[in-house]
Regions:
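Thiol/selenol-based redox catalytic cores and closely related redox-interacting motifs
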Residues: 105-174
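Short beta-strand/turn micro-motifs composed of small residues
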Residues: 51, 82, 158
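N-terminal "domain-start" segment that seeds a small globular fold
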Residues: 7-41
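Short active-site neighborhood of thiol/selenol oxidoreductases, capturing the structured segment around
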Residues: 36-67, 77
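Structural microenvironment flanking redox-active thiols in thiol-disulfide oxidoreductases
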Residues: 60-113
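Cysteine/selenocysteine-centered motifs that mediate thiol-based redox chemistry or coordinate metal-sulfur cofactors
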Residues: 192-224
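Short loop/turn microsegments at loop-to-beta-strand junctions
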Residues: 21-22, 47, 151-153
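A short, polar/charged loop-to-alpha-helix boundary motif
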Residues: 172-188
Length: 224
């Protein structure tokens, strides 16, 4: 199953399961100041895919796949997080609306908070990544092959930002390949939760933060 394949790779951020992402506000390409906990509310869990910058070939490839397979997204919602500013994405897309949120985190605050990893050289490569880069190069994309590359992170979160599942990618393409895979992961997470005991008590705060406020959050005790 997609969940088993991801779990077998090892998860460096697995200790975060059962904790909560603090409340914060975020910008999308078209709307500033959105409430993260409002995004988490509802009857369906939220799958968050952390990607490199919006102009990165891997980001473009997977956002396109998710757009093309959106009809398969049942029982779960999707949000993609990118290391780009809302203005940059809005300019690149000419202000187009996306059918799922694009959370813009140019400074990488969420990436740091959740321990999103980077890798250099061949350690981050896969055959799929090579194909993506080859196509991008043919289309004029230039990149520094020696520069560290952001590895993807897949999260499933519930109410109040509670982390139900987390997977740190081992390569640049170690993430759900399309919306069908996202749906299957969410189903298996739900089945696991239904069968097992309750996880650790949710850590959350009533205070609404901005992304920069997340820095140093663990230095204080915010259990309520």
């Amino acid at each position: 199953s997609p969940l088993e394949r991801m779990c077998n790779c090892g998860m460096s951020s697995e200790h975060l399961v059962g904790t909560s992402i603090p409340r914060f506000t975020f910008d999308t390409p078209t709307t500033p100041g959105n409430d993260f906990y409002a995004l988490c509310a509802g009857t369906e869990p939220l799958c968050m895919i952390f990607l490199p910058g919006f102009d990165h070939p891997v980001t473009r490839e997977y956002v396109t796949r998710y757009l093309k397979t959106l009809s398969a997204l049942k029982g779960v919602r999707l949000a993609c997080v990118v290391r780009s500013s809302a203005r940059t994405v809005a300019q690149a897309t000419q202000g187009a609306e996306f059918p799922f949120p694009i959370i813009c985190d140019a400074p990488g605050v969420l990436y740091s908070y959740l321990g999103v990893e980077q890798a250099r050289g061949l350690r981050s490569w896969s055959f799929a990544a090579q194909r993506i880069y080859k196509t991008a190069k043919e289309q004029g994309y230039r990149y520094d092959s020696s520069a560290p590359q952001i590895l993807p992170l897949t999260l499933v979160v519930g109410h109040l930002g509670k982390i139900l599942f987390i997977h740190s990618g081992r390569s640049q393409t170690d993430l759900p390949e399309d919306c069908t895979a996202i749906r299957e992961i969410a189903r298996e997470v739900a089945s696991t939760l239904a069968a097992g005991p309750e996880g650790p008590r949710t850590r959350c705060s009533d205070e609404t933060l901005t992304l920069p406020d997340l820095v140093g959050w663990d230095d204080v005790d915010n259990d309520r």
